[in-house]
Amino acid sequence: MALLQIAEPGQSAAPHQHKLAIGIDLGTTNSLVATVRNGQAEILLDEKERPLTPSIVHYGDNVTVGYDAGELASRDPQNTIISVKRLIGRSLNDVQARYPNLPYRFVRSENGLPLLGTAQGNVSPIEVSGEILKKLTALAQHRLNGELLGVVITVPAYFDDAQRQSTKDAAKLAGLNVLRLLNEPTAAAIAYGLDSGREGVIAVYDLGGGTFDISILRLSRGVFEVLATGGDTALGGDDFDHLIADWISEKSGIQPQDDQQKRLLIELAARTKIALTDKPQVSLSYQGWQGEMQREEFNGLISGLVKRSLMACRRALKDAGIGQSEVQEVVMVGGSTRVPFVRDQVGEFFQRRPLTSIDPDKVVALGAAIQADILVGNKPDNEMLLLDVIPLSLGIETMGGLVEKIIPRNTTIPVARAQEFTTFKDGQTAMSVHVVQGERELVGDCRSLARFTLRGIPPMAAGAAHIRVTYQVDADGLLSVTAMEKSTGVQSSIQVKPSYGLTDDEITQMLKASMENAKEDIGARMLAEQRVEARRVIEAVLSALLDDQDLLNDEELSTVKNALVSLDNLQQGTDTQAIKAGIKALDAATQEFAARRMDKSIRRALSGQSVDSL
């Protein structure tokens, strides 16, 4: 059975109220959460005004996340999960082959995925990631003091489907509505506003604490395409720290004797690295030894690692079929790109000055926040980030072969719109959803995209069910259609690419046909609408006669039946006004019948009740 529309999509009570959304950079070493306030993206700080949350989870008597968990890492390494991002979406065999020296107690799950044995039992990487996301969500809700409508979470461009789905599952555990997973390099480019700049090739050089990633993107018509990715999962700022620590041990002649001393030495090395970002030399003190490190010495130590990263850049460019001179912008991401030597070497390699004006630790989260702000509808259409539009209206078939447009043509994507529909017949338990594309008024003149059926609608009177149909088009032009019966929550959905197989010429022809046939289409629509209304009225009267025909005398019954036959004949014709008149005639013929049925219902309802009880 096709659909009968009952409601226009209404605006919220406060359509211009700013909707709360966040962007999360779920990092290997650290994670951040950001939002857009007063038109500006900003990082949300924790209770101690810190922007970063260490991606560390400790399982003890309680679950601890962040800095507090990090302090327990050296004392209780088996229950302190660090860099879980390396494990998510991977099989246990893959994890053990890639990272043979991890201190965790691994347990194989039934599907071959890793579980980590902790003081609180076995936990999956998804659950660990979920704890980090819960921490970030709580931080955001505290700072924003309101309900979050959704989140954009960033993932590496090279993440496969399993890793992306696992990230979504972690977000679900944290109670988050994921608006979109966004590639980290794309988020960084968005933060710099490159999405609205000239088209061309962008390189994103991401050197974090534990990993290095290079991504080559092409911007075309507001859409980022990942041309190639590369990197090194064992190269990052932590390696810089270890090189400095080894240098200090060698210069001082003092080797750390236990884990505590090793940790203190690494912390000293990290402080030295940070200080050398701004100073040409740094004074050092280690267990009674006094020394000094020059920036040139530091550059010499890390030179080999930086060259390794540039070799990965060269391979990525080759994979993309792009020359170094074709790269128009280079975006720096990750705290380790603050090192002046790294910036100089990258600039020399790509033959242009890298973009460094945004804090490289924050740039990905800021881009995610900008995207989230748009996806919840805070930006007007002319400021949409992703500039693709829907070339032809997307609609749904309603009763009588009519088209109800859900998303009009030229709407900027991503976009989501919904309308409510109801059943046409008593006891109807299923509904056919026919998705169409085009500008014409009748289904037969539009392009059919997909069909699916919503089953499990509770049997009720015609018009009593409420089915919400949602059309959502993502940034890649993929249309998801979901139909949900509101009282039970039962739903069904389908995905389709509206642009698949559609040429520019066909779009032009369809638009031209809609303009040329506009008058005839409106007339056909009015006729179809009157036919639908006539059939609805006929169905209702026949059902009433089946139950209460005895309320009419022979003459009255004959009058009603004659009006029914007349309307049935008229609705098979093509005279819209005649059908309209026939509906009015049947309505007039059944008014007394309707009044008697109402009286009967009232008497039945009051049967057996005393006057005092009323």
Curated annotation (Swiss-Prot):
GO BP field: iron-sulfur cluster assembly
Keywords per UniProt: ATP-binding, Chaperone, Nucleotide-binding
Pfam families attached to this UniProt entry: HSP70
Record GO terms (molecular function): ATP binding; ATP hydrolysis activity; ATP-dependent protein folding chaperone; unfolded protein binding
PROSITE patterns membership: HSP70_1, HSP70_2, HSP70_3
InterPro entries noted in UniProt: ATPase_NBD (IPR043129), Heat_shock_70_CS (IPR018181), HscA_NBD (IPR042039), HSP70_C_sf (IPR029048), HSP70_peptide-bd_sf (IPR029047), Hsp_70_fam (IPR013126), ISC_FeS_clus_asmbl_HscA (IPR010236)
Disulfide bonds: none
Protein family: Belongs to the heat shock protein 70 family.
Functional description taken from the UniProt entry: Chaperone involved in the maturation of iron-sulfur cluster-containing proteins. Has a low intrinsic ATPase activity which is markedly stimulated by HscB.
HAMAP family: HscA
Name the record gives this protein: Chaperone protein HscA homolog
Protein species of origin: Actinobacillus succinogenes (strain ATCC 55618 / DSM 22257 / CCUG 43843 / 130Z)
